[in-house]
């Protein structure tokens, strides 16, 4: 994927994520962006960090749950926690039985039976939204997170310097990291590693542990 293929903020929203998208980025071993073993390593870090921070995880909301890798590893790492998977793709909802919905307007209480969760996971979703929709999504993530949020969103710097463009979808809205940090900072403490603890959780961090 060349740099010129990365979408600018004015681009049209992608309306669907069908079988071809998931075949390329998740099923094909040569072109997939991640797999369950990678998510297991990541989730093991998140679980260990939250245990250290004394943030209990009894409920998990995975927004944009995709092919269900977080569900698989959540059963191993948090066996007592209840997992809720929400997915925008109609294709995946039919395949896996997820609750269909969007991070921009999901009514969690009405659709899932609860308004907030100990851990919210939102991985690789927000870069598919324009600025206004992404800002609305961040407000919702703050509303749903009682304990912690794990957030991953591709930024301009990531596209230039960090990601493997050969397997990363460049048809996205690239923004600066400050766009996310400024909005997250109102509601979360940045604990590092993509982990953000809700200010409602009352987590005490030493100065160099996070912001």
What name fits each language-model region?
Residues 121:
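A conserved beta-strand element that flanks and buttresses the S-adenosyl-L-methionine
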Residues 124-128:
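Short catalytic micro-motifs in class I SAM-dependent methyltransferases
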Residues 1-113, 129-211:
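Class I (Rossmann-like) S-adenosyl-L-methionine-dependent methyltransferase catalytic domain
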């Amino acid at each position: 994927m060349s740099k010129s293929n990365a979408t600018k903020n004015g681009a049209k929203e992608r309306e669907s994520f069908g079988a071809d998208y998931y075949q390329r980025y998740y099923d094909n071993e040569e072109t997939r962006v991640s797999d369950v073993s990678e998510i297991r390593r990541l989730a093991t870090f998140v679980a260990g960090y939250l245990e250290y921070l004394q943030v209990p995880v009894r409920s998990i909301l995975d927004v944009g749950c995709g092919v269900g890798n977080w569900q698989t590893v959540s059963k191993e790492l948090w066996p007592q926690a209840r997992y809720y998977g929400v997915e925008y793709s109609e294709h995946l909802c039919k395949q896996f039985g997820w609750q269909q919905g969007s991070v921009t307007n999901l009514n969690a209480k009405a659709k899932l039976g609860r308004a907030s969760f100990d851990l919210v996971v939102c991985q690789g979703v927000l870069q598919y939204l324009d600025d206004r929709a992404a800002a609305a999504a961040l407000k919702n993530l703050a509303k749903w997170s009682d304990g912690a949020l794990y957030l991953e969103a591709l930024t301009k710097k990531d596209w230039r310097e960090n990601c493997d463009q050969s397997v990363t979808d460049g048809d996205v809205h690239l923004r600066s990291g400050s766009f996310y940090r400024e909005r997250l900072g109102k509601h979360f403490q940045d604990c590092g590693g993509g982990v953000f603890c809700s200010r409602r959780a009352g987590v005490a961090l030493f100065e160099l542990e996070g912001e």
